[in-house]
Structure formats: structure tokens, C-alpha cells
């Protein structure tokens, strides 16, 4: 409930810190609404400070749904912005942290070229497409990547047995071990792995509608994730309803995620519009 205060303080502290450390960055890369005020504050209060002049700001969008929207009273009570600058963060009668970053950052990036195009569409933009259309000249999508040293089944220490495309035998060992770890019986049925945040934009409603049907087709499911309580409860119920078919771990365990990527036959990405997610790349 106090996230606006927390991240306002954090954003201001980032810039104040630069006055007191022996390092001047060339670029400040700010991610999502939680640090969206950094380019706002820099443009208003810090660009003219001699020891901080010349720094460029880049704002990266991972999910445009979460924008940091609050009442306009935040401008005077919390943000400490001068009256003349309220229009920078105002959008549709609210303070919108992300909109402020769009206005003031030198560059706007996001996690894929496709997503950069999609968020110009009202269907995907969650209301911010008019602003982004006016900022197209500084909007670029860079495709997400993964660390191939970390996501490498031939060397991954989290796996019970390593394997590769040239030597794939360890894949079957990983599948058997995964089923045992998740409390499911071994068998020949295809195993579908899901590693995701359990929220609506990641496809929670979509998979809830078809889950019973998919279990009926003969799949086994191993699921790792956390998020909104309603979706966590759905998967808990499915694990109770199909104890030999569905196993769920609520939370995020990095090593288990690697074992799901390695042991599952199919990686399921239910999000209707995944923004260049790392899960499919990792699997």
C-alpha cells in the first residue's frame, strides 16, 4: 500500500547517491514503474548539477500493465515535484510513473521488437499507446536473451544427469527424477512443464479454462510459480483433484526451474501475449 512512497524514495536516493560515490555512470538504465521516476528527477533536478551532467537515461518496459498509477495529490505530498512539472507525470487525471519516464528518458526499450510494436496498439498498451506513439522515435525492442553458461543441460549442476543434443540419454533420467521429486508416478505420458508467475497476463485465466481438458488428453503437469492467490488456489485444487497427474510448487526455486526445463517433454507458456519471456529460451 505504500509502494509509491518506497519507490519514490528509492528513485531519489539513486540520484543522491551519485553525489557521494567515486563513479559517474554514462547511462542509467531504469526498469519498470518502480524506477520510472529516476529519469523524471534527473531531468528536473540533476541534469544541471555539474558533476552529474551528461548522463543519459534509458527506461526499459518489461510489462506495460504495471504503470505505477496514483492520485494527483502524490505530486505535492510525496514526489516533491515543482508545480510546473506536474504535467510530466499526469495522465488521465492520475499520477502515472511510467508515463513520466516516457516523457523524460533519453531512450525507451523493451524486451523484443514484437512487443515494441504491440504496445503501440490499444489492445496491448493498457492505455499508454497515445503517449508511446508520440515517442516512437526513441522506442526500441531488444530480444531477451539468456546466459548459455547457466542454461546449458550439458553442464548444469542442478540436473541429476547432464545431456546434450549429441548425447541425449540423460534427458530420460532427468524426466524420471523430476517426476519423483514432484511426487508423480513414473510413466510414458508426456510431461508438460510450467514455470511462470501465476497472474492474469501470464495466461492464468486461459489455462484455468482448459486445464481439465488437457489433463484428460493424458498429460502430466509439473508447475512452479507464485502470484495472485486465485490462480495459486486453482493449481492447488488441480493437484488435489489429479494427484497422479498434477504437481504444484508455489514459489520460485531456481534449481527446480532448471530441472523442469530439462525433464519436461513440453514447456507450456500460457501467456496470451508473452513479452519476449525468458522461460521458453531457458527450456
Positions of the model-derived regions?
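Catalytic cores of nucleotide-sugar-dependent glycosyltransferases that transfer UDP/GDP/TDP-activated
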Residues: 1-283
Amino acid at each position: 500500500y505504500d509502494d509509491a512512497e518506497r519507490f519514490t524514495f528509492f528513485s531519489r536516493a539513486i540520484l543522491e547517491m551519485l553525489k557521494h560515490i567515486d563513479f559517474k555512470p554514462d547511462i542509467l538504465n531504469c526498469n519498470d514503474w518502480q524506477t520510472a521516476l529516476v529519469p523524471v528527477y534527473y531531468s528536473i533536478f540533476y541534469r544541471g548539477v555539474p558533476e552529474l551532467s551528461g548522463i543519459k537515461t534509458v527506461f526499459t518496459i518489461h510489462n506495460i500493465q504495471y504503470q505505477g498509477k496514483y492520485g494527483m495529490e502524490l505530486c505535492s505530498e510525496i514526489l516533491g515535484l515543482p508545480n510546473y512539472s506536474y504535467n510530466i507525470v499526469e495522465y488521465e487525471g492520475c499520477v502515472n510513473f511510467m508515463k513520466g519516464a516516457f516523457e523524460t528518458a533519453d531512450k525507451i526499450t523493451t524486451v523484443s521488437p514484437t512487443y515494441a510494436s504491440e504496445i503501440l496498439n490499444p489492445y496491448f498498451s493498457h492505455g499508454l499507446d497515445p503517449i508511446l506513439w508520440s515517442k516512437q522515435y526513441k522506442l526500441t525492442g531488444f530480444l531477451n536473451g539468456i546466459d548459455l553458461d547457466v542454461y546449458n543441460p550439458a553442464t548444469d549442476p542442478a540436473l541429476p544427469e547432464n545431456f546434450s543434443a549429441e548425447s541425449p540419454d540423460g534427458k530420460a533420467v532427468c524426466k524420471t527424477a523430476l517426476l519423483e521429486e514432484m511426487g508423480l508416478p513414473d510413466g510414458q505420458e508426456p510431461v508438460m512443464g510450467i514455470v511462470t508467475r501465476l497472474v492474469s497476463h501470464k495466461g492464468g485465466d486461459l489455462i484455468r479454462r482448459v486445464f481439465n481438458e488437457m489433463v484428460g488428453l493424458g498429460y502430466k503437469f509439473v508447475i512452479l510459480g507464485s502470484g495472485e492467490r486465485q490462480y495459486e488456489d486453482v493449481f492447488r485444487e488441480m493437484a488435489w483433484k489429479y494427484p497422479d497427474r498434477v504437481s504444484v510448487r508455489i514459489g520460485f526455486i531456481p534449481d527446480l526451474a532448471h530441472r523442469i526445463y530439462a525433464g519436461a517433454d513440453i514447456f507450456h507458456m500460457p501467456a496470451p501475449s508473452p513479452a519476449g519471456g525468458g522461460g521458453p529460451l531457458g527450456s
